[in-house]
């Protein structure tokens, strides 16, 4: 326990007694087309948000909180029910390139993890010199392979150096 009560591995907001809802804005690790999101409420059995929604925007650089407040947000997951202690999966039907997403929880509650899945679409203006065009971080994707017995072929295009054989 901490000075505010039980400590959770996730984001939990205090009980909301006034109208409204809570939200968190996430800058994507790489800009891209969002194909789906996961709002994972693992271990939040009674204090999970009963409803969630996700919006997205595209803003260059590192905008301030005021810039984010003034941004034009588009709903990519409409307000929809969520379950507790569950990886709530939602498909996204959008072909636009996004840089930030905003998870809203109604009215409050706890979320263990928020995952945003999609295709990386880098801004070519920010690429200099020789670029690894096969790299996952630059939009590369493994589309097929003959064998996945020991590991995923996606490992071939992950960033950084290999850490081990296992």
Residue ranges and their predicted role:
Residues 45-60:
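Short, surface-exposed beta-strand/strand-loop-strand elements in extracellular ectodomains
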Residues 1-29, 45, 120-166:
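Disordered, acidic Ser/Thr/Pro-rich linker "stalks" and the adjacent N-terminal cap
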Residues 32-46, 101-103:
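A short beta-strand element within beta-rich, extracytoplasmic domains
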Residues 28-31, 71-110:
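Beta-sandwich interaction modules
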Residues 40, 55-59, 117:
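Predominantly extracellular/luminal cell-surface or secreted proteins
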Residues 2-15, 63-91, 161-166:
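Intrinsic, low-complexity N-terminal interaction/targeting segments
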Residues 111-122:
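Short, structured interface segments
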């Amino acid at each position: 326990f901490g000075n505010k009560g039980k400590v959770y591995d996730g984001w939990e907001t205090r009980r909301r007694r006034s109208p409204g809802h809570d939200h968190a804005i996430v800058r994507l690790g790489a800009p891209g087309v969002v194909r789906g999101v996961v709002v994972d409420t693992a271990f939040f059995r009674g204090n999970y948000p009963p409803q969630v929604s996700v919006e997205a925007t595209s803003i260059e650089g590192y905008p301030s909180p005021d810039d984010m407040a003034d941004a034009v947000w588009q709903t990519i997951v409409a307000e929809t029910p969520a379950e507790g202690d569950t990886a709530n999966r939602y498909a996204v039907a959008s072909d636009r390139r996004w840089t930030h997403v905003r998870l809203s929880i109604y009215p409050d509650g706890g979320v263990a993890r928020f995952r945003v899945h999609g295709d990386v679409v880098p801004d070519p203006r920010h690429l200099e010199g020789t670029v690894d065009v096969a790299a996952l971080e630059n939009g590369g994707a493994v589309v097929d392979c003959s064998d996945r017995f020991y590991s995923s072929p996606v490992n071939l295009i992950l960033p950084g150096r290999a850490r081990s054989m296992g």
